[in-house]
Amino acid sequence: MAVVEAETRVFLEVRRRLQSALLILGEPDEGGMNLDISVTPTSLLMRSPDGCTEIRLPAGVRLAPSSCGGLQYISGDGLHLRLRAQAESSPQPISGFNQSLQAQECCSFYCQSCGEVTIKDRKLLRVLPLPSENWSALVGEWCCHPDPFANKPLHPRENDCFVGDSFFLVNSRSDLEQEPKANTKVICKRCKVMLGETVSSETTKFYMTEVIVQPSEGSFPNIPRSQFVQSVIARCLVELCTARSTFRFTIQGQDGKVYILLWVLNSDSLVMEPLSSSGCIRKFPLLEDSLEADSGSAWNAIKVLYQPCIKSRNKELASSWEGDISVHPLTLPSTTCLELLLILSRNNASLPLSLRQMNSFQLWCSHCKT
């Protein structure tokens, strides 16, 4: 095939379950030249008068060139075509908390923004997942006798850590000089960022987007803030979709205000997006904050539709979602909710134009570690 391009943006998405691939060859910013494109089972080859560029597919991914179909040109976006594809299955998601922390380990809690130690050298004898936020109501529905857990909240003991959907609960009695009051904010001493809040005089809730938990012998990992927030939220969504078959979520602040509506489309995508230019391959902005690997790498992705709910936008839709028991709320600090909205907007702007919206929703395509 031949198209007129000056600098071609290549976007490839492989759906593992559907065994299909979408290939988008973008339009040049300005000018143009003849470009011949060949699709082989393991690579994309682009030839121009100035040279030849080959983009190799990652191991385990194969295309079927003879299955090319749905060829169309979309103005402002480029050439689209669909093919049959095969990709190895991705590993099952593992709790990101348990990847780096196991019971019996001595660990420390750090402020993710500045690296300040919040809890130092805490030996955790039990690391336990919490039930869903509505577990008490479910007990009342299913039990034929009075609820034995009524008015008995779950509080961790001194060497416990309870893991919720978007937070950790730890016993803070031994780390504080004076007994704290319930329902007060926990602020980082160095950068003054809100890390969590006290649930009771002995229990502190730390939000997963604000702290990093590391074994004490390890060092503080310096991860860019936007990359960290994206990965935490993406991991939470994948785990909840897998465990509870829940696909719609609200992102709300600790004050109960809804900031974002999320609707998970799929988490089985493999995305590859280099930018080719006269014999070289380099990263495209969608990957710059997400990966440290080379530009030829592919990444597991979760695709999520979202709607902002700030400044009274989508007020009726947000209200209807809040009243729907199939919609799961995720609570974060209000400042992080606004930060996440900016991250989603920037991510959306880096996608091919035709993929940025679906009906009235916008698309977020995030790197998802497994």
Swiss-Prot record:
Pathway: Protein modification; protein ubiquitination. GO terms for biological process: proteasome-mediated ubiquitin-dependent protein catabolic process; protein autoubiquitination; protein monoubiquitination; protein polyubiquitination. InterPro entries: UBQ-conj_enz_E2-bd_prot. Residues 332-368 are annotated as: HECT-like. Ubiquitinated by UBCH10 (E2 ubiquitin-conjugating enzyme). One of its GO terms (cellular component) is nucleus. Its main location: cytoplasm. Keywords: Acetylation, Cytoplasm, Metal-binding, Transferase, Ubl conjugation, Ubl conjugation pathway, Zinc. GO terms for molecular function: cyclin binding; ubiquitin conjugating enzyme binding; ubiquitin protein ligase activity; ubiquitin-like protein conjugating enzyme binding. A motif (BRAT1-like motif) lies at residues 129-159. It is found in: Cytoplasm. Zn(2+) binds at residue 144. It catalyses: S-ubiquitinyl-[E2 ubiquitin-conjugating enzyme]-L-cysteine + [acceptor protein]-L-lysine = [E2 ubiquitin-conjugating enzyme]-L-cysteine + N(6)-ubiquitinyl-[acceptor protein]-L-lysine. Its EC number is 2.3.2.26. It is an enzyme of class 2 (transferase). Residues 214-236 are annotated as: Interaction with UBE2C. E3 ubiquitin-protein ligase which accepts ubiquitin from specific E2 ubiquitin-conjugating enzymes, and transfers it to substrates, generally promoting their degradation by the proteasome. Independently of its E3 ubiquitin-protein ligase activity, acts as an inhibitor of CPSF3 endonuclease activity by blocking CPSF3 active site. The C-terminal half (AA 188-389) is able to bind cyclin-B and shows a self-ubiquitination activity (mono-, poly, or multi-ubiquitination) in a HECT-like sequence dependent manner. The BRAT1-like motif mediates inhibition of the endonuclease activity of CPSF3 by forming hyrogen bond and hydrophobic interactions with the active site of CPSF3: Cys-144 coordinates one of the two active site zinc ions of CPSF3. PANTHER family: E3 UBIQUITIN-PROTEIN LIGASE E3D, E3 UBIQUITIN-PROTEIN LIGASE E3D FAMILY MEMBER. Interacts with UBE2C/UbcH10 (E2 ubiquitin-conjugating enzyme). In vitro, interacts with cyclin-B. This is E3 ubiquitin-protein ligase E3D. It comes from Rattus norvegicus (Rat). The gene is Ube3d.
